[in-house]
From Swiss-Prot:
SMART domains: B3_4 (SM00873), B5 (SM00874), FDX-ACB (SM00896). Mg(2+) binds at D461, D467, E470, E471. Its EC number is 6.1.1.20. This is Phenylalanine--tRNA ligase beta subunit.
Amino acid sequence: MRVPVSWLREYVALPAEATARELADKLISLGLEVETVEEVGADISGPIVVGRVLTIEELTGFKKPIRFCTVDVGDANGTGEPQGIICGARNFAEGDLVVVSLPGAVLPGGFAISARKTYGRMSEGMICSASELGLWEDHEGIIVLPEGFAEPGTKADDLLGLRESVLDIAVTPDRGYALSLRGIAREVAAAYGVEFTDPAVRPLPSAAEGGYPASVADPAICSRYVLRGVTGFDPAAPTPLWMRRRLHLCGVRSISLAVDITNYVMLELGQPLHAWDRSTLRGPIEVRLARPGEKLETLDHVVRALDPDDILITDESGPINIAGVMGGLSTEIRETSTDILIEAAHFDAAHIARTSRRHQLSSESSRRFERGVDTDIQLAAATRAVELLAELGGATIEDGITHIDHTVPREPIVVRAGHAGRVAGVDYPVETEIARLRQVGCEVVQEGDTLKVTPPSWRPDLTDPNDLAEEVIRNEGYENIPALLPQAPPGRGLTRGQRLRRAVGRTLADRGFFEVLNYPFVGVRDFDRLRLDEDDARRTAVRLANPLNDDEPLLRTTLLPGLFKALVRNVGRGFTDIALFEMGLVYHPKPDAPAKAPILPVDRAPTAEERATLEAALPEQPRHIGAVLAGQRLRSGWWGGGEPATWADAIHTAKEAASVAGVELIVRAAQYAPWHPGRCAALYVADGDREVLVGHAGELHPRVIKAYGLPSRTSALEIDWDRIEAAAAAATAPQISTYPVATQDVALVVDASVPAAEVEAALREGAGELLESVRLFDVYTGDQVGEGRKSLAYALRLRAHDRTLTVEETNRIKDAAVAAAAERTGAVLRG
C-alpha cells in the first residue's frame, strides 16, 4: 500500500515538522512493515510556473509540426514580458493555462532547462507534459490546466504536488484495514496521539428504499449489499489533476473519471467498489454462487469457466461480475455511459480468496476482500462515490438506495483485566488497557476484574484476548518492554522421547541422509499416485477448511508424498545420488470426532471438560520416520565401481533407526502400496507373544516411480516411531560379554522366490540364544546355483556370557541354524 503523506495529513493533525522518515519509524514501532520511503520529485528544482498561452505561430519547413508560442508567465521571468517557447504538442490553444519550466529549472532525471536557439527561434523554457514533470504517464501532450486554476506566474510545483513523500507499506494478511488511507491514518493518529478525522463519517441518507432491485441468495456469502445510482453523468468529464496525481502516487493507473472515482474511494476508505453502465443491466441483480457450466468474459477479455464456489453478481442475462475479484466485459463503463450504478458490498473473505487463487486473478479488490473489509462502511463508500460523480462529472444522485443488511453483531470478547500485562511481562494499569483498546476503535465495558471488549467493524482480525493484548502492547510500544532474560524453571532436561528422536536423527545423518521438513499438506492425487486402494485407511484424511492450495486440501496420512517431491526437486538440481529422511507427524481423523474443534480461552486455564472436548476433536497424530534413497550409495572411483542404493539399504536403514531405541525389527515379506510387491518388507516389533506392525520398507513400485518422476529403482521406508518408542519402553540394557566372539559364515541356496528375511528368521531360531547377530552380506544368482535359484551368504556372530565358545559348540550352533533354515525354507548348504 503506497501512502502519500500529503493525503494522510488531510485526516491526521500531524505536526508540521514531522518528516516521512519519522512517520515510517512510528508505523514500524506499531508493527507495520514500511518497506521504503520514496521522495518523489526530490530532483526537481528551479522555476516551474503557471503560464497562459498568448499566441501560437505555426512554423513550416520542418519534418514535423512545430509551434512558436508566446506565454505569459507573470513576473516569474523577472521582466514581466511574455516568454517565447518552441513546442511540438498540438493539444492546446491560445488562451489555455499551461505549466512552464523556465531556464534554470531541473526536471526529473536531471533534465536541465535552458534558453537555446532551435528551429530558427530562441526558446526560453519548456511547456511541460505530465510525464515530463513526473506526475503520471501521459502521451496525450502537454498539461492543459482548468480555467481559474491559478494566475500566470504562480509557482506550479506545490499546486501540482510535484514533490511528495510516499510510504510503501507491506500489509500483512491480518491487517486488511491498513490497505486504505483511513486505516493508516488511524494508526498514525494513535502513534502521535493527535486527532483523527474519519473520512467515513459523513451525513448518510436515512431512507433505503426505491433503489435498483437486488437480492442476496445466501447471507453467508454476502452480509451487506448496497447500490446507489446517478443519472446524467458527463462521460467526457476529465479526472481532475489532483485525483490523477494521487492515484498515480498510489500506483493506480487513471482510466476514466467514473472508474477513477471508484479506485479513489477504495484507496481512501478501503472499500472496493464496482461501477456498471446501468443501460447494460437486464433486470434485477442477484448475488449467488455459480452454477455448473456457467461462464463469464471478464474485463481482461478472458472467458472464464466458473466454479460452484465462486460468488457471482448476476442479472436476467446471467453472470455479470465475479464478485470481489473482477467485473464482466458486457457491463463495463464505456465512453458513452451516462447512467451509472455503484456497488458496495461485504463478501465472504474465504470465498474471495479461493476464487482469486482458482482463476489466478489477484486484483486490488480481491486483496482487500480476502483480508477482510469493514462490515459497516458500504453505504458511506457508495455515498462518497456518487457525491464525487455529481461534483466532478455533473451527475444527478438518485434518491433510491438498495441496502441489504444481513450483518450479525459481533460478540464481545471477555478478557481479564491486566491480561496484556501478563502477556508482555509489564504492569499496565487497567486504565491504560482500556484507553489503548478504545484508541483502536474497540468498545470496552469494565465489569469487576473483567473487560467486555467489542472489536470495531474494520478489525476482523481481533478474535480473542491475545489479539487484544497485542493491540495494547504495540500501542504502548514494543520498545518499552524491558529486556529481561526469563528465569528458566528447574527441569530434568530433555525427555526420553526427545533424546531418542535426536539420537535417531544423528544416526541417519551419520549414514549420509539429509533431513527435510515438508509441508503436511497432500491431495487426493497423491493417494492416486501412491496406488492406494479405495478402502485404504490412508485415504481417510483430515480436510482443511481454508487450505493454502486447493490441490492439497488434506493433512498427510503418510510422509512419502512430501519426500518424493523433495527428491524430485533435488534430482532436478543435479543431486542424483541422494538420501533424504523426515521425522514428522501424520494425521488420522477419529471416527467419532466432532465436526468442529472448540476454541479454548487464552486468558485462563481451560477446564478439564474443555480440554477433553478439544482432545476428542483433534485427529490422531502419530510420529513417523520416512526416508527415500536414489542413485548410488557408494560412488565409483579409482577404488572401483559404485554400488547402487537398493531395497536392502532401505530395510537396513529402518533396522538401524529402530536399534537406536534398543528395538530389533522383525522383517517379513509383504505386498503393500506404494512398494514393489516382490521387493517389499513389512517391519514388526515383538510384543510378548505377538508381533506389532510398525512400518514397511523396500523398492517402490515402477508405476509409482513413473507417476512422481523419481529415479528408477528408488527405495523408501516409513515406520511408526511412536510404536517403536512404546516397544522400547520395557527394554533393558543388554548383558555385555567380555568373552571373544566366534564367527561362522554360511551360504544357503534357496528358490529365487524365497524372501531373505524368512531365511534369516529361520537361522535366528535355529541358532538359539548364543547368536548375537546375523547379517546378509552376499546374494548370488548364476549358473553355479541353477536357474530359478539364488545363494544367500550370512555372517553369524556367536558369543557366550560365561565362557569362550569352542569350535565344537560353534559348529553345532551353525548346523542347527542351517537345519532350521532347510526345514522352513528348503535351503541347501552351498558347497
